[in-house]
């Protein structure tokens, strides 16, 4: 099994759409792909990232562990619900149960890299370290993204983690000077693996499949699965 952790520089940067696009591309390439979302918040507001991944990507191997009603950070959402966060051991066992030779397992975090997902401050970075997984970082194209991206990459490097690259999660239809200048600057920080159009989540499945097919390099995706 190859595990790839998908994180973002912030919440709302397009992690779920990026995860769905990569999963869709992998499925089309004939790769056995699974997607897991260990911690989901905001279920009372209808947030269901795995359902969105299923609708957009056509992937059927989906798994979730902990779900909390309020649209808050996991620690606050768990406290508001009177529930516990999963332990480190539960999180790792949950991901490990998806294990299968030749499978690509995408693990979508919640918020950014250092947001607590589990008891005792466990983060997506901690999971990546324990799993020996590379991390794909979803970024904004807007003002402020260079600092946020550099900080995320620095946090990965501090634990010896490999960055699998960047995905620009929502490229505007009419980019301005900020976006057009940030794009090469992001590419100088780490390889940009895909640039997804703003509004991709609203596309029909067939349209989204076409977008995902053109967004990623097929050889890179195939190499992810080993």
Swiss-Prot record:
Its EC number is 6.3.3.3. Mg(2+) binds at residues 16, 49, 108. InterPro entries: DTB_synth_BioD, P-loop_NTPase. The active site is at residue 37. Gene3D superfamilies: P-loop containing nucleotide triphosphate hydrolases (3.40.50.300). It is found in: Cytoplasm. It catalyses: (7R,8S)-7,8-diammoniononanoate + CO2 + ATP = (4R,5S)-dethiobiotin + ADP + phosphate + 3 H(+). ATP binds at residues 12-17, 49, 108-111, 197-199. Its main location: cytoplasm. GO terms for biological process: biotin biosynthetic process. Substrate binds at residue 41. It holds the Pfam family AAA_26. Pathway: Cofactor biosynthesis; biotin biosynthesis; biotin from 7,8-diaminononanoate: step 1/2. Keywords: ATP-binding, Biotin biosynthesis, Cytoplasm, Ligase, Magnesium, Metal-binding, Nucleotide-binding. GO terms for cellular component: cytosol. One of its GO terms (molecular function) is dethiobiotin synthase activity. Its cofactor is Mg(2+). PANTHER family: DETHIOBIOTIN SYNTHETASE. Catalyzes a mechanistically unusual reaction, the ATP-dependent insertion of CO2 between the N7 and N8 nitrogen atoms of 7,8-diaminopelargonic acid (DAPA, also called 7,8-diammoniononanoate) to form a ureido ring. Belongs to the dethiobiotin synthetase family. Homodimer. This is ATP-dependent dethiobiotin synthetase BioD. The gene is bioD.
């Amino acid at each position: 099994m190859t595990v790839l952790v998908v994180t973002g520089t912030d919440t709302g940067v397009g992690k779920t759409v990026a995860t769905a696009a990569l999963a869709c591309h992998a499925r089309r390439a004939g790769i056995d792909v699974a997607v897991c979302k260990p911690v989901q918040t905001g279920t009372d507001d209808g947030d269901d990232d795995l359902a969105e991944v299923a609708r957009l990507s056509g992937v059927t191997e989906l798994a979730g562990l902990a779900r909390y009603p309020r649209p808050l950070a996991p620690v606050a959402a768990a406290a508001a619900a009177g529930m516990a966060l999963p332990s480190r051991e539960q999180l790792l066992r949950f991901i490990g149960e998806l294990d299968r030779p030749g499978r690509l397992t995408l693990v979508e975090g919640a918020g950014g890299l250092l947001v607590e997902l589990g008891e005792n401050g466990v983060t997506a970075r901690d999971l990546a370290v324990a799993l020996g997984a590379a991390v794909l970082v979803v970024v904004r194209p807007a003002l402020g993204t260079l600092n946020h991206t550099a900080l995320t990459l620095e946090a990965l490097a501090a634990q010896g983690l490999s960055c699998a690259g960047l995905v620009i999660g929502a490229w505007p239809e009419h980019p301005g000077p900020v976006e057009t200048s940030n794009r090469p600057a992001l590419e100088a920080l780490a390889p940009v693996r895909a640039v997804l159009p703003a509004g991709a989540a609203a596309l029909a499945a067939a349209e989204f499949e076409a977008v995902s097919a053109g967004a990623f390099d097929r050889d890179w995706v195939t190499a992810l699965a080993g």
